Protein backbone atom coordinates (compact mmCIF):
# COMPACT_ATOMS: atom_id res chain seq x y z
CA UNK A 1 0.00 0.00 0.00
CA UNK A 2 1.42 3.36 -1.02
CA UNK A 3 1.75 6.46 1.09
CA UNK A 4 -0.81 9.24 0.69
CA UNK A 5 0.16 12.90 0.61
CA UNK A 6 -2.54 13.81 3.13
CA UNK A 7 -4.17 11.99 6.02
CA UNK A 8 -7.93 12.07 6.44
CA UNK A 9 -9.24 14.24 9.28
CA UNK A 10 -11.49 11.45 10.52
CA UNK A 11 -10.18 8.07 9.29
CA UNK A 12 -13.25 6.21 10.59
CA UNK A 13 -15.56 8.31 8.40
CA UNK A 14 -13.41 8.39 5.25
CA UNK A 15 -12.10 6.09 2.54
CA UNK A 16 -9.45 6.41 -0.12
CA UNK A 17 -8.24 5.10 -3.45
CA UNK A 18 -5.20 5.66 -5.63
CA UNK A 19 -3.81 4.84 -9.03
CA UNK A 20 -0.14 4.84 -10.01
CA UNK A 21 1.53 5.29 -13.40
CA UNK A 22 -1.77 5.81 -15.20
CA UNK A 23 -1.40 6.33 -18.96
CA UNK A 24 -3.44 9.52 -19.11
CA UNK A 25 -2.25 13.09 -19.68
CA UNK A 26 -1.10 14.77 -16.47
CA UNK A 27 -2.19 18.30 -17.38
CA UNK A 28 -5.72 17.38 -18.42
CA UNK A 29 -6.17 15.15 -15.38
CA UNK A 30 -4.90 17.85 -13.03
CA UNK A 31 -7.44 20.38 -14.33
CA UNK A 32 -10.28 17.84 -14.15
CA UNK A 33 -9.36 16.81 -10.59
CA UNK A 34 -9.14 20.45 -9.47
CA UNK A 35 -12.65 21.00 -10.77
CA UNK A 36 -14.23 18.11 -8.84
CA UNK A 37 -12.39 18.78 -5.56
CA UNK A 38 -14.82 19.43 -2.65
CA UNK A 39 -17.79 18.25 -4.75
CA UNK A 40 -20.27 15.73 -3.33
CA UNK A 41 -19.55 12.28 -4.75
CA UNK A 42 -22.84 12.02 -6.69
CA UNK A 43 -22.32 15.44 -8.29
CA UNK A 44 -18.71 14.62 -9.21
CA UNK A 45 -19.74 11.36 -10.90
CA UNK A 46 -22.52 13.15 -12.79
CA UNK A 47 -20.10 15.93 -13.80
CA UNK A 48 -17.56 13.44 -15.20
CA UNK A 49 -20.31 11.67 -17.16
CA UNK A 50 -21.41 15.05 -18.53
CA UNK A 51 -17.82 15.79 -19.56
CA UNK A 52 -17.71 12.51 -21.46
CA UNK A 53 -20.98 13.46 -23.21
CA UNK A 54 -19.68 17.04 -23.77
CA UNK A 55 -22.58 18.50 -21.76
CA UNK A 56 -20.26 20.28 -19.29
CA UNK A 57 -16.68 21.41 -19.83
CA UNK A 58 -13.63 21.32 -17.58
CA UNK A 59 -12.29 24.84 -17.03
CA UNK A 60 -8.56 25.13 -17.77
CA UNK A 61 -6.88 27.63 -15.46
CA UNK A 62 -3.20 26.74 -15.06
CA UNK A 63 -2.36 24.68 -18.14
CA UNK A 64 -4.38 26.84 -20.51
CA UNK A 65 -1.87 27.74 -23.22
CA UNK A 66 -3.51 27.21 -26.60
CA UNK A 67 -6.76 25.99 -25.07
CA UNK A 68 -9.78 27.21 -27.01
CA UNK A 69 -12.70 29.10 -25.58
CA UNK A 70 -16.11 27.55 -25.00
CA UNK A 71 -19.41 28.90 -23.75
CA UNK A 72 -19.76 26.17 -21.11
CA UNK A 73 -16.74 27.58 -19.24
CA UNK A 74 -18.77 30.66 -18.25
CA UNK A 75 -20.41 28.79 -15.36
CA UNK A 76 -16.93 28.37 -13.84
CA UNK A 77 -16.04 32.06 -14.28
CA UNK A 78 -13.51 31.53 -17.06
CA UNK A 79 -13.47 31.38 -20.83
CA UNK A 80 -11.17 28.46 -21.63
CA UNK A 81 -12.36 24.90 -21.32
CA UNK A 82 -12.12 21.43 -22.83
CA UNK A 83 -13.68 17.97 -22.55
CA UNK A 84 -10.83 15.60 -21.52
CA UNK A 85 -12.73 12.34 -22.01
CA UNK A 86 -9.91 9.95 -21.07
CA UNK A 87 -9.10 11.88 -17.88
CA UNK A 88 -12.78 11.85 -16.95
CA UNK A 89 -12.91 8.09 -17.53
CA UNK A 90 -9.88 7.41 -15.30
CA UNK A 91 -11.19 9.67 -12.52
CA UNK A 92 -14.63 8.06 -12.77
CA UNK A 93 -13.10 4.59 -12.28
CA UNK A 94 -11.08 5.85 -9.31
CA UNK A 95 -14.17 7.42 -7.69
CA UNK A 96 -16.13 4.19 -8.17
CA UNK A 97 -13.28 2.29 -6.52
CA UNK A 98 -13.30 4.70 -3.57
CA UNK A 99 -17.10 4.43 -3.34
CA UNK A 100 -16.92 0.62 -3.14
CA UNK A 101 -14.27 1.00 -0.42
CA UNK A 102 -16.70 3.28 1.44
CA UNK A 103 -19.52 0.74 1.16
CA UNK A 104 -17.16 -1.93 2.49
CA UNK A 105 -16.44 0.33 5.49
CA UNK A 106 -20.18 0.89 6.01
CA UNK A 107 -20.24 4.59 5.10
CA UNK A 108 -23.27 6.32 3.59
CA UNK A 109 -22.35 6.96 -0.05
CA UNK A 110 -24.98 9.72 -0.40
CA UNK A 111 -23.19 11.84 2.21
CA UNK A 112 -19.66 11.41 0.81
CA UNK A 113 -17.72 14.31 -0.67
CA UNK A 114 -14.23 14.60 -2.16
CA UNK A 115 -12.09 15.92 0.68
CA UNK A 116 -8.74 15.49 -1.07
CA UNK A 117 -7.73 14.73 -4.63
CA UNK A 118 -4.21 15.07 -5.94
CA UNK A 119 -2.55 14.42 -9.28
CA UNK A 120 1.24 14.00 -9.45
CA UNK A 121 3.53 13.51 -12.42
CA UNK A 122 4.81 9.98 -12.99
CA UNK A 123 8.07 9.15 -14.79
CA UNK A 124 7.77 9.91 -18.51
CA UNK A 125 7.72 7.03 -20.96
CA UNK A 126 10.02 7.43 -23.94
CA UNK A 127 9.27 6.37 -27.49
CA UNK A 128 10.67 7.61 -30.80
CA UNK A 129 9.35 9.10 -34.00
CA UNK A 130 11.30 9.12 -37.25
CA UNK A 131 11.82 12.42 -39.05
CA UNK A 132 13.18 13.51 -42.39
CA UNK A 133 16.89 13.22 -43.23
CA UNK A 134 17.40 10.26 -40.88
CA UNK A 135 16.68 12.11 -37.66
CA UNK A 136 14.88 10.68 -34.64
CA UNK A 137 12.83 12.77 -32.22
CA UNK A 138 11.50 11.76 -28.80
CA UNK A 139 7.83 10.84 -28.50
CA UNK A 140 7.18 11.20 -24.77
CA UNK A 141 4.07 10.44 -22.74
CA UNK A 142 3.17 12.15 -19.45
CA UNK A 143 1.51 9.62 -17.13
CA UNK A 144 0.35 10.52 -13.64
CA UNK A 145 -0.40 9.23 -10.15
CA UNK A 146 -3.85 10.05 -8.72
CA UNK A 147 -5.02 9.77 -5.13
CA UNK A 148 -8.44 10.59 -3.71
CA UNK A 149 -9.91 10.68 -0.20
CA UNK A 150 -13.68 10.67 0.31
CA UNK A 151 -15.15 11.78 3.64
CA UNK A 152 -18.65 11.55 5.04
CA UNK A 153 -20.23 14.93 5.72
CA UNK A 154 -20.93 15.54 9.38
CA UNK A 155 -24.39 16.42 10.59
CA UNK A 156 -24.24 19.83 12.16
CA UNK A 157 -26.63 20.67 14.95
CA UNK A 158 -27.75 24.29 14.99
CA UNK A 159 -27.81 26.40 18.11
CA UNK A 160 -31.11 26.71 19.94
CA UNK A 161 -32.25 30.29 20.08
CA UNK A 162 -33.59 31.47 23.44
CA UNK A 163 -35.66 34.63 23.52
CA UNK A 164 -34.48 35.67 26.98
CA UNK A 165 -30.80 35.10 26.18
CA UNK A 166 -30.91 37.32 23.11
CA UNK A 167 -31.27 40.82 24.48
CA UNK A 168 -31.13 43.85 22.31
CA UNK A 169 -27.73 45.49 22.59
CA UNK A 170 -27.89 49.18 23.44
CA UNK A 171 -24.93 51.51 23.28
CA UNK A 172 -23.80 53.60 26.25
CA UNK A 173 -24.89 56.78 24.49
CA UNK A 174 -28.39 55.46 23.96
CA UNK A 175 -28.61 54.27 27.59
CA UNK A 176 -27.58 57.72 28.80
CA UNK A 177 -30.24 59.36 26.60
CA UNK A 178 -32.91 56.97 27.90
CA UNK A 179 -31.96 57.72 31.53
CA UNK A 180 -32.01 61.45 30.81
CA UNK A 181 -35.44 61.15 29.20
CA UNK A 182 -36.79 59.23 32.21
CA UNK A 183 -35.41 61.87 34.58
CA UNK A 184 -37.25 64.64 32.70
CA UNK A 185 -40.60 62.86 32.93
Curated annotation (Swiss-Prot):
GO terms for biological process: cytoplasmic translation. CDD domains: Ribosomal_L22. It holds the Pfam family Ribosomal_L22. Gene3D superfamilies: Ribosomal protein L22/L17. Transmembrane segments: none annotated. Residues 160-185 are annotated as: Disordered. Signal peptide: none annotated. The keyword Ribonucleoprotein applies. Keywords: Ribonucleoprotein, Ribosomal protein. GO terms for molecular function: structural constituent of ribosome. The keyword Ribonucleoprotein applies. InterPro entries: Ribosomal_uL22 (IPR001063), Ribosomal_uL22_CS (IPR018260), Ribosomal_uL22_euk/arc (IPR005721), Ribosomal_uL22_sf (IPR036394). GO terms for cellular component: cytosolic large ribosomal subunit. Belongs to the universal ribosomal protein uL22 family. This is Large ribosomal subunit protein uL22. It comes from Maconellicoccus hirsutus (Pink hibiscus mealybug). The lineage of its organism: Eukaryota, Metazoa, Ecdysozoa, Arthropoda, Hexapoda.
Amino acid sequence: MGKYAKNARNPAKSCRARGSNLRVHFKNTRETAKTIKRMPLRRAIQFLKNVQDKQECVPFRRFNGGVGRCAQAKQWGTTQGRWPIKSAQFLLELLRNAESNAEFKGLDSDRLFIEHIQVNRAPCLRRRTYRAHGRINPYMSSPCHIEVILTEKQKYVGKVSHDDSQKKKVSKKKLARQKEKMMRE
